[in-house]
Amino acid sequence: MDNRLLEILVCPLCKGTLQHDRAHNELICHVDKLAYPIRDGIPVMLADEARQTVEGTPVDPA
């Protein structure tokens, strides 16, 4: 995932920042507790495609 793209992408619901979880290939919104999948290098920024995250689950940024 391109770091320049990560800098401009925001959560489509709350417009908050996203954190890249490389281990699970997802973009995480901690405000809405949603994880948006990245498929074939393309972030799928649709709320219907996002999964709910578990409160307190650490994100692996490595």
Curated annotation (Swiss-Prot):
Pfam families: Trm112p. It comes from the Bacteria. Transmembrane segments: none annotated. GO terms for cellular component: cytosol. PANTHER family: PROTEIN PREY, MITOCHONDRIAL, ZGC:162634. Belongs to the UPF0434 family. This is UPF0434 protein RSc2531. It comes from Ralstonia nicotianae (strain ATCC BAA-1114 / GMI1000).
